Amino acid sequence: QFTTLGQNITALEVDGTFDDCQALVKSAFMDEELNRHMKLTSANSINVARFLPQSFYYFNAYAQLDKIGKADQLVVSVPSGNFGNITAGLFAHRMGLPIKRFVAANNRNDVFLEYLHTGVYTPRPSVPTIANAMDVGDPSNFARILDLYGKNGNPHAEISQLISGYRFTDEEIGATMKQVYNETGYVLDPHGADRK
C-alpha cells in the first residue's frame, strides 16, 4: 500500500483482523509510557480529522443533485465497515443537510444491522469477505453515532428512523459487480457493489 515512507512512518504486518489492528492502535494510544516518548495519531476513522472532511462531499452531492432538480427525498447508501463514512454523513445531516435517509450497507459483518433489528449492540469477531474493508466486527464509530442520537434516552428509535441497513453476501456482491460490468463496462469494486 505504501510506495514511499517518511522517516517517521513504519508499516507493520499484523496476523489478524481489522478489529485486532484497531485494538492495538487503541492500546498504544492509552499507553502512557509510549505516549511520553512519541506523538501518535491514527490515519483511520478513529481520528475525527480523517472522517470529518468526508462530510463535505455529502454537501457536494446534494448541491449537484439540486442543480438538476433531484435533491428532494435524498437517500444515501454507504458501505459500512468502521462507520467513519456514514458518521461523516450523519454529521452533515446534523449540520442541516436535508438527507431523508441513510442506508448502511453491510457484508456478513452485520453487527449494525443486528442493532437496527434488535436494539442490542453485540460486537463479534469479524469474518473475511470479498469486501474486506468492511470486515469489522466492532465499528469504533458506533459510539459516535450513539452520542449523536442518544440525547433523548432512546438512541435506537432515533437512529432507526434515519438509518436502514442491509446485508449482502459475497455471491450477491459478485453478481452485482458482474452485472454492472456487463451493462456499462465499468469494473465496480466490492465495496461499491455492496450498495446496490
Describe the predicted segments one by one.
Residues Q1-K196:
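PLP-dependent amino-acid enzyme catalytic core
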